Amino acid sequence: MIQEGKLEQQFFDYLHSERNYSVNTSTAYENDLLDFRRFLNEQAITTYQQVTFLDVRIYLTELKQKSFSRTTVARKISSLRSFYTFLLRENVINENPFTYVSHAKNQLRLPKFFYSEEMEALFQVVYEDNETLTLRDRVLLEVLYGTGIRVSECAGILLPDLDTSYQAILIRGKGNKERYVPFGAYAEDAITDYLPERVNLMSRYKKSHDALLVNHYGDPLTTRGIRYCLTKIISKASLTRKIHPHMLRHTFATDLLNNGADMRTVQELLGHASLSSTQIYTHVTKEHLKSTYMKHHPRA
């Protein structure tokens, strides 16, 4: 049975001291957490770490059956998402089970992904010339799309992490969990072309480190720097809809499932602690199939 303890108190202290929430708002959060804890105890779930996306769906169904207003449900979702975001920040959990639950409609918030023509436009940008930073961006795009790793994980890749004989990269994920992810021929060729230019750039600025990706001064490329580079690539590709770099990870998972990969393998490649975090992509692939049908079938 889950009882109120140190985690909850730390969260409430965080709301008061760092978020400056009012007493009324904090009380609402406490009540929402109390109600969720009651539900977990009824489900024989003994720790917050055990909660999965499917448990969240069951809880939302229960709220709907109790005829809570949409506003109340949205507030409860917001409270619990904030609590789990706090647990994630404190390294208590590896995945936030509330990530893909929508505030407004109490529905899944499906991950967005790139369509094939959009991916082609992105790759055209990084293959337009062989300048040093273009070669770097080519590695960036080929590795992110080819492995599905997070932007933060990409920033942490060191040269010793590359195993070119097996075409695999050692990745340090959330909670410092390590996993090997394979990469394909395109990524291998991009890395091979880039490494000599990386050496030249670092020598020019007298830099010495093992980071795979570097900026224009030869320093390690940070997570923020990677996001900036990707934003520039997206801008050059003239893609019109609202796009964010994490969509490359979503596209990796969606493309694998669309082409017959099994769920467990995709889970392992993504570094998801829970299979429920990966199951969200089955909804994406169904939506993709439906949208493709509606777009291309003459009788749709």
From Swiss-Prot:
Residues forming the catalytic site: 150, 174, 246, 249, 272, 281
Localization in the cell: Cytoplasm
One GO CC term, this protein: cytoplasm
Any one Gene Ontology BP term: cell division
Limits of the Tyr recombinase domain: 109-294
InterPro entries for the chain: CB, DNA_brk_join_enz, Integrase-like_cat_sf, Integrase_catalytic, Integrase_recombinase_N, Integrase_SAM-like_N, Recomb_XerC, Tyrosine_recombinase_XerC/XerD
Name assigned to this protein: Tyrosine recombinase XerC
Source species of the chain: Listeria monocytogenes serovar 1/2a (strain ATCC BAA-679 / EGD-e)
Upper lineage: Bacteria, Bacillati, Bacillota, Bacilli, Bacillales
